């Protein structure tokens, strides 16, 4: 044993320090004294003999000499086995090799790489460690499981690299692959595409890429995982849900229903999720639609938290809503005001129907303009000629001309818009060479066949339509349709609240239609009459909740409703306003009775009134008077207070959700109402947008996908996209009120420290930067007016805060600015100290 250890140490002696050698000598000395054996056969052994000279007893014993060789062979592997816990041994195999040095044979342990065609090997004794093995796996095979590596990324907007650590995780990589299939709508068999597989293998040869069947299974598992997360999230939502429902027919001629829920979360951000996208069999009767919708709500356990349902104006939907309300009332779902606010008709669909009725009056002229567009776009050569004329008229050639779609009135508007834009080019094209113009268009174009005579009619039509004087009414028509188009776009948004915009927008449309009825052009008057009939039909049955949403807009309140009521109803407007106020109070009373945190304010009546009530023997009447007294008092403290305050003066874009978020403490019940009412969707665009994705998922090449996997793909994409947006998108709604002072402080610290300012007068000279900071902060005055009541006070506080920051950062004497620091409110001082501590 002594010879084997000493010789092995001599072979590797150049790797060790002399102190380690002394420790080993001491260890050998103790072993020699305890086992009473030992021989010296090499020069280093003679040194050990000299050291052991005071103890000569171990040398004269020859009997243990034949045993040292087998003992290390048995004990050494046992000691090494305890240390073979590293994961590198999954890719290396230990082998013992016998080597001869100076005529003596020794055993060395080497680790051989297990990868094919790799002949790398490294010494595997315990004192060599595993660093060499890991370096080989990382550099030659890109495989070091669990090891942190460095990745380099470009910082956005800067020419610098950001180096961040990352750790390879096979499970995470597989999840990313299946998320890519879902989010980008790749086919399942992409995992079997030859070059895709080669690409993945080039990045990581042992990546476990599987078949399309396995990919489908993983996607279903991911869908169930995300579904469970969403279920838990919806369970914790405190507000009510508004829903949208719509139908769609795929290329398989299968009908799909999409149900989307909308709510305002605790951060007052509007959220939406698709909770159902499934195949509906059989006839689309109202009863079947109601049963399907109710089953979805029960499945997600939100049937008792519904506020409204937005639908198209179909007869089956009318029956479905009636049945849904009855079903929910039977299940004790506690609908708001017994479902009076539940049914919301799609505003965009109403505008579509009204505009189509108006366009039907001038269908002949629309067809002529449509024929002109077809004639121009009938051949590439004709289109090139038009683009040359457009260049000569300094028009944008990339704009193009849209084509009319019979089911979408807005496509008619876009066609008119583009035709009017290219009007100078069309006139130039017509006058350039009429005969050549006719010959170029003698071809078949989609649904139209143009002969020479027919083209003469088309050219004549162009002369009429494009004639400057006679074409003015087309410009008027375009302006009329633009009002419909702009309002449709405004009400189609899903990332912001649209409920408060409906009433004002529809009142403006009604006012315009009334004006068009008296227009000097006969065509416009005919259109206006047709539009007015359809508009009045839906105006009478519009949901009162959308007027409530307008009332909850601090820019309008009850004043806007009174304005339009007086305009439309004349002297009888007060009756309609009083009816609306009664609806508001009824809604307020409902939320007051349901709110556990409703304020219970003491009555303002005199003591004699209380004594009379206490002595009253009619308990029911007494309780009623108490309830009435408390109810009236709460109203006077909150609802009437809101109505009595002046309108908010605000120009530009207004974030109504942020405004109400800052009033939770001031209006606890009204904020609950606003949180539910402002989540109403006035259009079904949110559900219709899912059908565009459905058309790509269930395309002609994948029309055999089952309804279950279709729902998994559509829903998972929607859920992941929403959660991903929540990770990186930070809006003003998500910034707490108290953090604005900290934000201003940090910006001022940047001006003070980073830009090299060392004393207060320098900072006073940089007031332009300070003004820009304040202007950026006051863009959302709905938050800022809670902290800073006007601009100049904010500016004064910011300058004082700047002085305060300069003193702290540069160690100036504090007493000269003591009075300035005293002006700062405590809600600014505390974040200032915290921010400076972190800084």
UniProtKB/Swiss-Prot annotation:
Entry keyword annotation includes Nucleotide-binding: no
For molecular function, the Gene Ontology terms on record are:
DNA binding; protein dimerization activity
UniProt-annotated stretches for the region Disordered: 32-85
Keywords in alphabetical order: DNA recombination, DNA-binding, Transposable element, Transposition
Q: Which biological processes are named by the entry's GO terms?
A: DNA recombination; transposition
Q: Can you tell me which residues the record assigns to a coiled coil? A: none
UniProt biased composition (Pro residues): 55-70
Classification via SUPFAM superfamilies:
Ribonuclease H-like
Query: Polar residues bias located where?
Result: 32-43
Instruction: Spell out the note in the miscellaneous section.
Output: This protein is coded by the transposable maize controlling element 'activator' (Ac), which is able to activate chromosome breakage at a specific location; it may be the structural gene for a trans-acting function required for transposition.
Q: Can you say what this protein is called?
A: Putative AC9 transposase
Lineage of source species: Eukaryota, Viridiplantae, Streptophyta, Embryophyta, Tracheophyta
């Amino acid at each position: 044993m002594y010879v084997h250890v000493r010789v092995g140490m001599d072979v590797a002696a150049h790797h060790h320090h002399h102190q380690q050698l002394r420790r080993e000598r001491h260890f050998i000395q103790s072993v020699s004294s305890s086992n009473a054996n030992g021989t010296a056969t090499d020069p280093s052994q003679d040194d050990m003999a000299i050291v052991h000279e005071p103890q000569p007893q171990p040398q004269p014993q020859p009997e243990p000499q034949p045993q040292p060789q087998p003992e290390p062979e048995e004990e050494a592997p046992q000691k090494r086995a305890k240390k073979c816990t590293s994961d590198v041994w999954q890719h290396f195999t230990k082998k013992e090799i016998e080597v001869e040095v100076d005529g003596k044979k020794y055993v060395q342990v080497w680790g051989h790489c297990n990868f094919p065609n790799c002949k790398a090997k490294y010494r595997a004794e315990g004192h060599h460690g595993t660093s060499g093995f890991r370096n080989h796996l990382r550099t030659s095979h890109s495989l070091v499981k669990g090891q942190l590596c460095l990745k380099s990324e470009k910082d956005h907007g800067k020419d610098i690299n950001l180096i961040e650590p990352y750790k390879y995780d096979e499970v995470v990589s597989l999840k990313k692959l299946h998320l890519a299939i879902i989010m980008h709508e790749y086919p399942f068999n992409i995992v079997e595409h030859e070059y895709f597989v080669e690409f993945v293998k080039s990045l990581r040869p042992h990546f476990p890429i599987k078949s399309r069947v396995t990919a489908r299974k993983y996607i279903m598992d991911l869908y169930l995982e995300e579904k469970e997360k969403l279920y838990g999230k919806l369970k914790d939502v405190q507000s009510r849900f508004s829903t949208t429902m719509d139908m769609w027919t795929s290329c398989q001629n299968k009908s799909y229903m999409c149900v989307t829920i909308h709510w305002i979360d605790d951060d007052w951000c509007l959220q939406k999720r698709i909770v159902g996208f499934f195949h509906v069999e059989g006839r689309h009767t109202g009863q079947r639609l109601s049963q399907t919708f109710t089953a979805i709500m029960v499945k997600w356990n939100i049937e008792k938290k519904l506020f409204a349902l937005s639908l198209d104006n179909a007869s089956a939907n009318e029956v479905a809503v009636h049945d849904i309300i009855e079903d929910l009332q039977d299940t004790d779902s506690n609908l708001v005001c017994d479902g009076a606010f539940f049914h919301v008709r799609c505003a965009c669909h109403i505008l579509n129907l009204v505009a189509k009725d108006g366009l039907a009056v001038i269908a002949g002229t629309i067809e002529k303009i449509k024929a002109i567009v077809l004639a121009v776009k009938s051949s590439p050569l004709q289109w090139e000629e038009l683009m040359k004329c457009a260049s000569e008229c300094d028009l944008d050639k990339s704009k193009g001309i849209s084509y009319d779609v019979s089911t979408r009135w807005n496509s008619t508007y876009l066609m008119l818009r583009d035709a009017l834009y290219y009007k100078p080019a069309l006139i130039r094209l017509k006058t350039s060479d009429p005969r050549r113009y006719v010959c170029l268009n003698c071809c078949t174009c989609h649904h139209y066949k143009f002969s020479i005579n027919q083209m003469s009619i088309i050219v004549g039509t162009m002369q009429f339509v494009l004639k400057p004087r006679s074409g003015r009414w087309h410009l008027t028509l375009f302006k009329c349709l633009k009002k419909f188009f702009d309002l449709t776009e405004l009400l189609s948004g899903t990332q912001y609240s649209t409920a408060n915009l409906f009433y004002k927008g529809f009142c403006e449309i009604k006012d315009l239609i009334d004006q068009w009825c008296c227009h000097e052009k006969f065509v416009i008057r005919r259109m206006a009459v047709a539009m007015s009939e359809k508009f009045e039909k839906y105006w009478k049955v519009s949901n009162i909740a959308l007027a409530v949403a307008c009332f909850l807009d601090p820019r309008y309140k009850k004043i806007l409703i009174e304005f339009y009521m007086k305009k439309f109803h004349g002297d009888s407007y007060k009756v309609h306003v009083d009816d609306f106020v009664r609806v508001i109070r009824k809604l307020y009373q409902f939320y007051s009775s349901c709110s556990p945190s409703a304020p219970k304010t003491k009555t303002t009546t005199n003591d004699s009134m209380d004594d009379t009530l206490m002595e009253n023997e009619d308990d029911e009447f007494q309780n009623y008077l108490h309830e009435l007294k408390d109810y009236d008092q709460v109203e006077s403290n909150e609802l009437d207070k809101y109505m009595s305050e002046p309108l908010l003066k605000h120009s530009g874009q207004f974030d109504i959700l942020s405004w109400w978020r800052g009033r939770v403490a001031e209006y606890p019940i009204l904020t609950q109402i606003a949180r539910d009412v402002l989540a109403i969707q006035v259009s079904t665009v949110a559900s219709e947008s899912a059908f565009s994705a459905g058309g790509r998922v269930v395309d002609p090449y994948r029309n055999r996908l089952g309804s279950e996997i279709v729902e998994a793909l559509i829903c998972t994409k929607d859920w992941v996209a929403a959660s991903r947006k929540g990770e990186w998108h930070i809006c003003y709604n998500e910034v707490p009120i108290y953090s604005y002072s900290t934000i201003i402080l940090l910006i001022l610290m940047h001006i003070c420290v980073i830009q090299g300012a060392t004393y207060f007068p320098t900072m006073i000279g940089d007031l332009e930067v300070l003004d820009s900071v304040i202007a950026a902060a006051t863009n959302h005055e709905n938050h800022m007016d809670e902290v800073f009541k006007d601009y100049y006070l904010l500016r004064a506080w910011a300058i004082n805060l700047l002085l305060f920051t300069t003193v702290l950062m540069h160690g100036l004497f504090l007493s000269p600015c003591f009075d300035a620091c005293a002006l700062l409110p405590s809600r600014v001082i505390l974040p200032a100290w915290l921010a400076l501590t972190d800084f």
